[in-house]
Amino acid sequence: MAKDNKISASHILIMHTESRNSESKLSKEEALKLANKLHVKLKKDLSAFKDLAINHSSCSSAQYGGSLGEFGKGMMVKQFEEAAFALGVNELSEPIETEFGYHLIKRDK
């Protein structure tokens, strides 16, 4: 387990028209299709994560390559937190759906 029950992770958020606080024009199906496409690319080359986050993520963390920094339990929505804490360091999640859209999560520490 991470020290002090905290981990460090990055993510790519693909929002859609049904996402909370969304300005996206992507349908839910289009967003999932894009998330799956990016997931396939990242499974082949995880080092592309930062560039893909900068170019595709709807989150303000995109400018930092998707980095969310360090966070503990209870700081993120449940589905995101469970997926992030289940990952090993430098592992990538499948697309995870939350009220904000689809996330690809990479555990950094």
Give residue ranges: language-model regions.
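Glycine-rich, flexible loop/turn motifs
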Residues: 64-67, 88, 92
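Well-structured core secondary-structure elements of compact alpha/beta domains
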Residues: 2-44, 60-75, 105-109
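Short, solvent-exposed helix-to-loop capping segments enriched in aromatics
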Residues: 75-87
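Short beta-strand/turn micro-motifs at beta-sheet edges
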Residues: 1-2, 93
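Sec-exported extracytoplasmic/periplasmic mature domains
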Residues: 39-47, 54-58, 85, 89
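FKBP-type peptidyl-prolyl cis-trans isomerase
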Residues: 7-17, 49-57, 80-83, 94-109
